[in-house]
Regions:
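Core domains of carbohydrate- and sulfate-ester-processing enzymes
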Residues: 161-162
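Short beta-strand-centered segments that line the small-molecule binding cleft or hinge
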Residues: 157
Length: 386
């Protein structure tokens, strides 16, 4: 029996050897596949060690638009926001769209920007809407309003209180599309050579101030000169004016106004907040891809947030620096401030009578402010008056 078992085992071994060494090669098949060999039959091996990535679509040729700015690129805040808009859109579009900023007067004079955009002589402009309020006084109310809303309240009305809808209508009538694309919060009221002790002393002054604030100053009896921020220093130095407003303390520091006038007045009643707009030709805007319009919207929203945050953060250091140079910081006497506010009321009533758009904008803003005041008092913990 033992010999029989040994014989069977030897026979099986010889059979396996013969099958593997002789039969299988003739059939050109492996006698047995390992697990790894089984897997290899289902894998297509690359021809080389490196597999090239699929070729991406070619980036479209960059589109370049020309944007006239009312503010020099080196000017803090206003010029800074214009340059920032240029950079932001370039990066958001991945280098496909460029809204190139041009310095004031390079493309067209600043007071001709709106006509140049409308005729497509240039592609866009960046400025406060007061620069084109000669087309419609209602644009003043989307720029800066004497004794008007704070920056927060202003933006709330624009974006969620009915302001934007009216603004869009006004721009459409001009063949334009406009976006709120920057902001300056509360400013200083002005720089003066001497302290101003009375309304009579104020009336005798020559003041560099434009916009609605300039109309108010004229109404109380003072003389005004409409100046760009960059021209204020020269006008003060040459004694062409007795005082002037420019912007926020950090901007005024850069302009060097403290070197000439030592009396700095607050509050900035004429411009509690100033909106900066980007305007483009209406047809050109509609012809942009939706993605491009969304990028411009996003860049403008970012600019507004930046302008508000930075504009508030920088002012204390500027004021501290002014005091080191002997500047005296004043607040207006009620004997001067109240007559200015009454003068503004008279002016805005007259403007409303002569322009239905102005009245419609003012009524919308007034209604919003009345309702907003209730929330502001409650949220601030201020006792409400019955």
């Amino acid at each position: 029996m033992r010999n029989l078992v040994v014989g069977v085992v030897v026979g099986l071994v010889i059979g396996v050897v013969l099958g593997s060494a002789i039969v299988a090669p003739r059939l050109k098949l492996p006698a047995h596949k390992t697990f790894s060999q089984e897997q290899d039959t289902n894998i297509t091996k690359p021809a080389s060690r490196f597999v090239s990535a699929p070729r991406s679509k070619r980036k479209p040729a960059p589109v370049h638009w020309r944007m006239a700015s009312a503010y020099a690129s080196q000017m803090p805040q206003m010029g800074e926001q214009a340059q920032r808009l240029d950079n932001s859109i370039w990066h958001l579009s991945d280098g496909v769209f460029r809204l190139k900023m041009y310095e004031p007067g390079t493309l067209v004079p600043s007071n001709q920007m709106v006509d140049a955009v409308r005729s497509q002589a240039i592609d866009a402009a960046f400025a406060a809407p007061s620069f084109w309020a000669h087309k419609n006084p209602a644009f003043h109310l989307f720029s800066a309003i004497p004794f008007g809303p704070s920056a927060q309240e202003y933006l709330s009305w624009i974006f969620d209180g009915g302001g934007r809808e009216i603004m869009d209508e006004l721009y459409n009538h001009q063949g334009l599309h406009g976006l709120v694309c920057g902001i300056i919060a509360s400013e200083g009221s002005g720089w003066f050579r001497d302290p101003i002790e009375s309304l009579e002393a104020f009336k005798a002054l020559r003041i560099g101030m434009g916009g609605l604030g300039g109309l108010v100053v004229q109404q109380v009896g003072a003389k005004t000169m409409n100046l760009n921020e960059g021209d204020v220093f020269v006008a003060l130095k040459k004694v062409m004016i007795d005082g002037a407003e420019a912007s926020q303390p950090a901007v005024d520091m850069d302009l060097g106004l403290h070197e000439i006038a030592r009396h700095y007045y607050f509050p900035g009643w004429h411009q509690p907040a100033t909106l900066l707009h980007l305007i483009v030709n209406g047809d050109a805007w509609l012809n942009l891809p939706k993605s491009r319009r969304a990028q411009i919207d996003a860049a403008c929203a970012s600019n507004v947030a930046y302008g508000l945050a930075v504009g508030e953060a920088r002012q204390f250091n500027a004021l501290r620096e002014f005091t080191k140079h002997g500047v005296r910081i004043h607040t207006w006497s009620p004997d001067i401030l109240l007559p200015l506010e009454k003068a503004w009321t008279k002016i805005r009533v007259e403007l409303g009578k002569g322009n239905q758009d102005f009245k419609r904008v003012w009524d919308s803003l007034t209604k919003f402010r009345e309702e907003y005041a209730i929330w502001r008092e409650i949220s601030a913990g201020t006792p409400m008056q019955n």
